[in-house]
């Protein structure tokens, strides 16, 4: 059981997500009343993976809360890459669809990179298209990956100084690690990117003022690996029979952190909320 004295150190992703959703709802209402446009999100799901279905449902519920029109496009698992690309092309040309989300992972015979590159950069709600990634690398942040965007929002809301601080990212994926590094560099942090193969990971994490962990390894980060007062974002998630765990040993690390996200209820809700914000951005830019 967590000591009540530590509760003020928890970054409540659900509360932050509600704030973002309220902003999006207001923006959606403005678009509808002033321009007669309802932002629309198309979600593409290939196959019947239970986890993917659950994630799509979560996103559709968020759409309902903010007034975004969501439509699901289902393809059987034995569909071809060509059929997927044809669907994406039709959605690119559908003026009622402002954002497109391709739910990953895809069945093994698909090329996810080719499919993501087929999505119009203007409708790339996930922020994964190389065009949008390239803009991020030169400091032009528009449609960026949702999880790093959520982390930045949390840093801003909690007034965490970033400029000149040591930021360490554990994980170098295209979804979190690499864009997270770019966004922190854009704010003049001194950034180190590590991963599960890094020699002496502890040497790096001990120096982190801001630590973002997205390695997908249960309790990879222990209390002796972080310094007093660090701000920690746990992006990892591991599901086991007895519960859901993050990459950070939360109950022990919170005793040293100044701020920390829990799993669940931390970065996850913020990620979905930022997706809603991106769909609104896509709709506004389509005018």
From Swiss-Prot:
Enzyme Commission identifier(s): 1.5.1.5, 3.5.4.9
UniProt keyword Transport, yes or no: no
GO molecular function, one term: methenyltetrahydrofolate cyclohydrolase activity
Pathway as given in its UniProt record: One-carbon metabolism; tetrahydrofolate interconversion
Domain of life per record: Archaea
InterPro entries, alphabetized: Aminoacid_DH-like_N_sf, NAD(P)-bd_dom_sf, THF_DH/CycHdrlase, THF_DH/CycHdrlase_cat_dom, THF_DH/CycHdrlase_CS, THF_DH/CycHdrlase_NAD-bd_dom
Residues that bind NADP(+): 171-173, 196, 237
Catalytic activity: (6R)-5,10-methylene-5,6,7,8-tetrahydrofolate + NADP(+) = (6R)-5,10-methenyltetrahydrofolate + NADPH; (6R)-5,10-methenyltetrahydrofolate + H2O = (6R)-10-formyltetrahydrofolate + H(+)
Disulfide bonds: none
Keywords: Amino-acid biosynthesis, Histidine biosynthesis, Hydrolase, Methionine biosynthesis, Multifunctional enzyme, NADP, One-carbon metabolism, Oxidoreductase, Purine biosynthesis
GO cellular component, one term: cytosol
Coiled coil: none
Keyword Nucleus listed: no
Function: Catalyzes the oxidation of 5,10-methylenetetrahydrofolate to 5,10-methenyltetrahydrofolate and then the hydrolysis of 5,10-methenyltetrahydrofolate to 10-formyltetrahydrofolate.
Assembly mode: Homodimer.
HAMAP family for this protein: THF_DHG_CYH
Protein name: Bifunctional protein FolD
Lineage: Archaea, Methanobacteriati, Methanobacteriota, Stenosarchaea group, Methanomicrobia
């Amino acid at each position: 059981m967590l000591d009540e004295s530590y509760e003020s150190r928890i970054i409540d992703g659900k509360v932050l997500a509600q704030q973002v959703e309220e902003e999006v709802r207001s923006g959606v209402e403005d678009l509808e009343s002033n321009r007669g446009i309802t932002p629309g999100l198309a979600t593409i799901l290939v196959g019947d993976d239970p986890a993917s279905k659950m994630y799509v449902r979560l996103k559709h519920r968020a759409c309902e809360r903010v007034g975004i029109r969501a439509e699901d496009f289902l393809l059987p698992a034995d569909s071809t890459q060509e059929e997927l690309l044809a669907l994406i092309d039709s959605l690119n040309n559908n003026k009622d669809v402002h954002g497109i989300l391709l739910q990953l992972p895809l069945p093994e015979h698909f090329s996810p990179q080719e499919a993501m590159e087929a999505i119009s950069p203007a409708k790339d709600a996930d922020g994964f298209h190389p065009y949008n990634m390239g803009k991020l690398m030169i400091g032009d942040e528009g449609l960026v990956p949702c999880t790093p965007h959520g982390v930045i929002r949390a840093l801003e809301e909690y007034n965490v100084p970033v400029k000149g601080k040591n930021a360490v990212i554990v994980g170098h994926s295209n979804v979190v690690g690499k864009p997270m590094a770019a966004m922190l560099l854009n704010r003049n942090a001194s950034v180190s990117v590590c991963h599960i193969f890094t020699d002496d990971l502890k040497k790096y994490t001990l120096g982190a003022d801001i630590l973002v962990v997205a390695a997908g390894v249960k309790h990879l980060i222990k209390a002796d690996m972080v310094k007093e007062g660090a701000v920690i974002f746990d992006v990892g998630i591991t599901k086991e029979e007895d519960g859901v765990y993050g990459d950070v040993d939360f109950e022990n690390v919170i005793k040293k952190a100044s701020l920390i996200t829990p799993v669940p209820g931390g970065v996850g809700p913020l990620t979905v909320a930022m997706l809603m914000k991106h769909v609104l951005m896509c709709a506004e830019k389509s005018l």
